[in-house]
Amino acid sequence: MTILCADKFGDVYALPLLPSPEEEKVEQPEAPAAETEQKDWLPSATTLTVHSGRNRKTLEEQLKQKAKGLAKSKEPMRFKHQLLLGHVSMLTDVVYAKVNGRSYIITADRDEHIRISRGLPQAHIIEGFCFGHEAFISKLCLTPSGLLVSGGGDDHLYVWDWQNCALKEKIAIRDSALAALQTQGLVAPGVDHASYKIAISGLWTLPTNGNNVDEILVACEGVPALFHFKMGDAHANHIPLAGNALDVAMIQTPISPMCLIISIDNIHKAGSTTEVRDDKVPRLQYFSRQADGEWVEDAHIATALSGFAHGKEADSNGLDAGESVVRSMLYNVENLRKRPGADD
């Protein structure tokens, strides 16, 4: 079995899930008998021989580089890996698809690109692109019927027939997020609704409910709610939460065939990514789906899994992570948005 792994520089690698003993051996580079001494490099020009402004600037940069010393070469990966493909922009998500015996790797990046590549061993072959996003893409999701859902910094989710690189539907997630915040009284007075931005932090597909209709759950960064959409229906059911949604897991129980375990931010105030809350709330919330399709909090599951919601804090060996460090770990999707006038 193979793991697909990507780095922020845009490269996607294949790694073995269970390496063989030979592959687990860390390859140590051969140590040279004597380290080659590198002579100090000196620019031939000096401040006495350079007169033009451009040349003086070049000389200054050369002298700065000499002061830093020679740059060390990048240390190679010391484990079995295979480079499959690369983007020229920061890569943000990867999904794997298999259709009629043929595999595909679907990747998204900060530059609004969705790329469809063949799977192993032909990942270097590009089948096509899904163009349409105007802001960064942060999440991809494949539905049971084979549709691709993408979202990021745009006002809409995009639903694709990715095999034909065709856009099928756009879902107005920004309006749903803003309405949820207004319902909970979390929109400050004077906020310009037209300029309100969202950042998609999670996309999850729900198992089909016997009606062959694709359904997805959506989380937006800094929003204390989950949004439940059905393909072809622009209306969203929103699940209000006690804190900002961080992650979702799905389980089945003898009582309920579909339950959600939702990790929430119990450090920051609901609807905020900067203000620290002064009340205590559990780290997890539990919801089960009713026969009418509605989601209600499930006290039975909450009791059964209470140890997870109020578990022991992680041991940080005395290191106190500052509030800004915690915030940067929890909220980093909006940072993908390009600012006017900023370098890409």
Specify the residue positions occupied by each region the protein language model found.
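Canonical WD40 repeat/beta-propeller blade segments in eukaryotic WD-repeat proteins
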Residues: 1, 86-98, 131-142, 177-209, ...
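Fungal intrinsically disordered, low-complexity polar regions
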Residues: 16-79, 180-181, 186-190
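C-terminal scaffolding/assembly regions of large eukaryotic complex subunits
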Residues: 224-225, 230-344
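Beta-strand initiation motifs
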Residues: 21-26, 68-80, 121-126, 166-169, ...
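WD40-repeat beta-propellers
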Residues: 12-17, 114-119, 157-161, 227-230, ...
